[in-house]
Amino acid sequence: MNYISVENLTKTYGIVTLFEHISFNINEGDKIAIVAKNGSGKTTLLNILMGKDFADSGTVVINKDIQVVLFDQEINFESGQTITEFIMSLDSPPMQALRNYQKSLTSDDSEFMEQAFIEMENQKAWGLENEMKQILSQLKITDLNAKMDNLSGGQIKRVALAKLLIETRVEHKHTLLIMDEPTNHLDVDMVEWLEQYLSRAMVTLLLVTHDRYFLDSVCDIIWEIEDKKL
């Protein structure tokens, strides 16, 4: 199944050409890494795929039946939000089922409780809360009631990474996971865990990283932007 088709993409900033006339396809199950020198347009290319930037010419066609999920360097959250609230703000049926089930535990409405239980069954969401805690634990995020505002930059990145991994877990439809430098702010143990997690995961992946060992372990396809070509 084809996820993304790119044809003859060119991007310039002023008089500087980042890349020109590049073409590629991403298919289901691909685990692809993009490598290049700094300033060669790796992150710009990801932003174009996500619709956050625009090419000067060329086409990007994204399969309408897939979900594209991005981990980048910009993390947005609401002021006062706890880690749990940030993670559980995901808009997906399994997460909605879990939110309703947790509300039902403090409700006197027996009909609401019964419906919440049925939702959990239908969405196969019973293991979701434990999996969420396990992923956060592996990334050394333990106080789930901590306010996002009070976290360090590195902690915020790790919480956002956890949210992304949980999102790919709960989305039942076809998902492309795009990751820009995911090992930043991770210690050796966390990098090793993430490497194993992504290697085992049945996910389609497009990855940018300077960690050559990590990308060699996780990805089976490596693309290089060199002399403005892919």
Predicted regions and their residues:
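ABC ATP-binding cassette signature C-motif
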Residues: 1-230
